Amino acid sequence: MKWRRDARDKRHFIIMSAVAALVLVIGLFFDQNGEQAVETSGTQTVTVREGAVTDAAVMAAPISESAVQAAATPSPEDGIYTYLQGPKSWKERREWSGKWGKTFYDGQSFGAFGCGFCCMANIYSSLTEYQCLPTDIYRYAKKVTYYPGGGAISWEQMQATLNSIGFETSLHHKPSTYKQFLKQVQEGRASLVLVSSANDSSYWKNTPGHYVTLFLYDKTDNTVFLADSGDPEHNRHRVSCKTIYKALKTSSDYHFMSIDSYNKEKDQWKHKGIKGNWVH
């Protein structure tokens, strides 16, 4: 009968409308790529793909044991000291800066001449069981060498100071080839080098002469971990040895020093503890 057919048509229309509405809701629920963003506890967001929604999919992926161990293992770079010398770094309270940056010693600002002392403090604190500040080794150098204070320290004075605290060192001129320089850097436990923008200005700008320290040579890419007390943007970065080689200041008596070894028995200082106002 006609009224029964009309009723069937009405039910069919209602069912089809409900199906269409359900499809629309599902389409809004999933994004265009068939993915759903599911918020989990904490700050993680897990992406779930349509058709593959499982209990595992809506949970954050577990962290592997090896990943946990890798995160817990400190990097060799973490144990390297890299002091900053200047007043600007101290004013900004940069990590590795200290009050010495704005202080005058023997009539001169430490920030103007302290790079050599930062280098020696880096070496002593990084390669031995002892620690010191740049100003500690500044005072020590005045006691054990003829360094008068209040200015840049010479190669010979730095070598005498380092020898007094247990290090075997060797002074070098710039080798004629980059390959020779790499070999000397690789053989040392660290290197103390003098760079100048007069020799190459690709990395150091407006730098007549500046001592920096090189640690942790990596033979896979021929880079070193740079301790640059004069520039926070250079400090604690890996730098190509080729960059260092090109910038070696050749108008100096010597161009770099290799830190060959350390003997605790020959360390006449054994400085324990760091006392001072600095950021770390």
Regions found by a protein language model. Give the residues of each.
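Extracytoplasmic/periplasmic, Sec-exported soluble proteins
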Residues: 107-116, 129, 146, 150-154, ...
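Active-site-adjacent structural segments surrounding the nucleophilic cysteine of cysteine proteases
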Residues: 4, 8-148, 270, 279
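Noncatalytic regulatory segments and standalone regulatory/sensor domains
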Residues: 81, 88, 94, 217-280
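Extracytoplasmic/secreted envelope proteins and their assembly/folding machinery
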Residues: 116-124, 134, 138, 155, ...
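Active-site-adjacent substructure of cysteine-protease-like catalytic cores
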Residues: 174-225
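Mid-length scaffold segments of soluble, non-membrane domains
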Residues: 132, 139-175
